[in-house]
Amino acid sequence: MPISVLVVDDSALIRSLLKEIIQADPELRLVGCAPDAFVARDLIKQHAPDVISLDVEMPRMDGLTFLDKLMKARPTPVLMISSLTERGSEATLRALELGAVDFIAKPRLGIAEGMQAYAEEIRAKLKTVARARLRRRAADAPAPPESAAPLLSTEKIIALGASTGGTEALKEVLLGLPAHSPGVVITQHMPPGFTRSFAERLDRLTRLSVSEARDGDRILPGHALVAPGDHHMEVQRSGANYVVRLNRQAQVNGHRPAVDVMFESLARCAGRNLLAGLLTGMGKDGARGLLAIRQAGGYTLAQDEATCVVYGMPREAVELGAAEDVLPLERIAAALLQQAARRGSGNRL
């Protein structure tokens, strides 16, 4: 049976383009197009769509307010349609917090041509989002108790990779890490501009100092670096330190940044000093790199199916034998810290 889709967007052009894109796929069935939240509400009651594409910025009732009401009254998988602006990226991150599963960024210029170029991605994301497991909105995790022996060390590195559903999963893991945590490197599939807003949001919410990575940044205790959109992030050893290197080489597994690029570079230079987790996401990116880390002596884990929004990347890792542990999201931070303590303190600062 085809997946039923409702399009909610105030732009007649976007509605028309999405209609054309959706109707070109026999696995998708368009049940309606709404110019605002009020028309959408009536269509949802009438058709109970499997997935909704929702514009962030709309008149009468903005997309975030509507999303908040929808998730409380009738939780439904939602794909956000966002503008590639700083305001748009902030709103999109808030939408993911409120329960949206994923997003597509509208091109800045040439919307008709740009949307058609993304047609396959839009159709694929609608199908993935429709099948996604909706997570109940949870309160922020309590701060972990401070350890008597701080984990300040330039040796240990926590590496995290994620895709669909990853912004909230990564937030939960980082909320579970103390200010004296080993340095953290993160690759989350996300376009340019969004990664900076994502890093700034994590910096405000967690006890770590979080920033978008710049080429040559050192990996330091209590700091987390997020791979910038459209750049691969590798890690290299530099004397007693680890530094990140950015490049714009070809996409890997259809992504730039790719988790495999980060994980495989870490396997080469850090080995036993690594604590790596592969979180929720579609596809297989990161599984091969996680296996390389395990083979190099690092600790590896994958998020379990029950707590993943999309159990794709972690499933691939488990099937490859790459994950030493398979854990629910709420236990991942504690497991990483426990393994860091077991593996010794390294070079204390």
Swiss-Prot record:
It is an enzyme of class 3 (hydrolase). It comes from the Bacteria. GO terms for molecular function: phosphorelay response regulator activity; protein-glutamate methylesterase activity; protein-glutamine glutaminase activity. The keyword Cytoplasm applies. Disruption phenotype: Mutant is defective in chemotaxis, but does not have an obvious defect in swimming behavior. Mutant shows strongly reduced adherence to a biological surface such as the human epithelial cell line, and a reduction in swimming motility. Also shows a highly attenuated virulence in C.elegans and in a murine lung infection model, and fails to induce strong inflammatory response in the infected mice lungs. Keywords: Chemotaxis, Cytoplasm, Hydrolase, Phosphoprotein. It catalyses: [protein]-L-glutamate 5-O-methyl ester + H2O = L-glutamyl-[protein] + methanol + H(+); L-glutaminyl-[protein] + H2O = L-glutamyl-[protein] + NH4(+). Changing D55E: Mimics phosphorylation. Shows a slight increase in affinity for McpB. Gene3D superfamilies: 3.40.50.2300, Methylesterase CheB, C-terminal domain. Residues 151-343 form the CheB-type methylesterase domain. It is found in: Cytoplasm. Belongs to the CheB family. Involved in chemotaxis. Part of a chemotaxis signal transduction system that modulates chemotaxis in response to various stimuli. Catalyzes the demethylation of specific methylglutamate residues introduced into the chemoreceptors (methyl-accepting chemotaxis proteins or MCP) by CheR. Also mediates the irreversible deamidation of specific glutamine residues to glutamic acid. Acts on the methyl-accepting chemotaxis protein McpB. May be involved in a specific chemotactic response, which takes place during infection and is required for P.aeruginosa pathogenicity. This is Protein-glutamate methylesterase/protein-glutamine glutaminase 2. It comes from Pseudomonas aeruginosa (strain ATCC 15692 / DSM 22644 / CIP 104116 / JCM 14847 / LMG 12228 / 1C / PRS 101 / PAO1). The lineage of its organism: Bacteria, Pseudomonadati, Pseudomonadota, Gammaproteobacteria, Pseudomonadales.
